[in-house]
Design a protein with these regions (language model features):
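Boundary at the C-terminal end of the N-terminal hydrophobic targeting segment
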Residues: 23-26
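N-terminal secretory signal peptides that target proteins for export/translocation
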Residues: 1-7
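N-terminal catalytic cores of secreted or lumenal carbohydrate-active enzymes
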Residues: 28-273
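Bacterial N-terminal signal peptides
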Residues: 10-20
Length: 273
């Protein structure tokens, strides 16, 4: 009999709790939300829309106002040789464009954008090294297998000597010479390119290039570009670079718009490399 009484009591308590919960919810007042889609309307700035590496035809089809030249390889673009280093994306190879004309890549990109009444956005390298080409514009490798030994991967089809920078032990190749496939870069080196762009197209105020992007994904340089930047850049170092290069650009074209740092994700703005 006691067991039955205890069980009945538990049921009664449970029912009471449920009833209480229902009663509490029943006391909530209804909320009514009205949205007036016609109120406080304003035009959306068209420059929130853009694409990357679009052709003139694609820009016209999409009616896109911005066209971005960016990505990992642009961090190592050498405007004098018109080539870049593909970094971790492709065996850390320095590869030349089809044209040997200095700055041709940027000039063609701007011309294609202007033909579609779009604005070009060019990436200016901030890394301390940019690509170097071999004789007759031949490829060069940052992690030559002949020089640094067997590695876990290589460009077996197109450039077999170009390794992936990982020894067969699984460890990263360390102590490599950046000069193997690169040359030093600085704001003075990049200033010559900015001045070339201004001489070709004018200042932003006179219809030239409007947007200069400060490099690409600096918080992961030590991964993407570990052949020339094996340690992570600190926030203080990045700030110094931004001030240096942005100041250089504005000194040459006060009307230019400088964008950066161009990061890979939100965490790049909170954590150093």
């Amino acid at each position: 009999m006691r067991r039955w009484n205890r069980a009945a009591a538990r049921v009664a308590i449970a029912v009471g709790l449920v009833s209480g919960a229902v009663a509490v919810h029943a006391q909530n007042t209804a909320v009514r939300i009205n949205v007036n889609a016609a109120a406080d309307r304003h035009p959306i700035n068209s420059n929130i829309y853009g694409v990357a590496y679009a052709s003139t035809e694609e820009l016209n089809d999409l009616n896109a106002p911005l066209n971005r030249n960016g990505g990992n390889n642009t961090s190592r673009y050498n405007w004098l040789q018109n080539g870049d280093n593909r970094a971790q994306d492709w065996y850390f190879e320095s590869i030349g464009d089809a044209s040997a004309v200095a700055g041709e890549r940027g000039d063609t990109f701007i011309a294609d954008a202007k033909a579609a009444n779009a604005e070009a956005m060019l990436t200016i390298p901030l890394l301390d090294w940019v690509a170097k080409l071999g004789s007759n514009r031949s490829k060069l490798a940052s992690f030559s297998i002949a020089k640094y030994g067997p590695q876990t991967g290589n460009d077996w089809q197109w450039f077999p000597d170009a390794g992936n920078g990982i020894w067969t032990s699984g460890q990263y190749v360390v102590g490599n010479d950046p000069n193997d496939a690169n040359v030093p870069s600085s704001s003075a080196f990049q200033q010559a390119w900015v001045q070339h762009l201004i001489s070709q197209w004018g200042t932003n105020a006179s219809g030239g290039l409007r947007y200069y992007i400060l490099d690409n994904e600096p918080s992961i340089w030590h991964s993407t570009h570990r052949d020339v930047q094996p340690t992570g850049v600190t926030m203080d170092q990045m700030l110094a670079k931004v001030l240096d290069y942005a100041g250089m650009i504005k000194n040459n074209d006060a009307s230019a718009l400088v964008i950066g740092p161009e990061e890979w994700g939100w965490s790049g703005y909170f954590y150093s490399g």
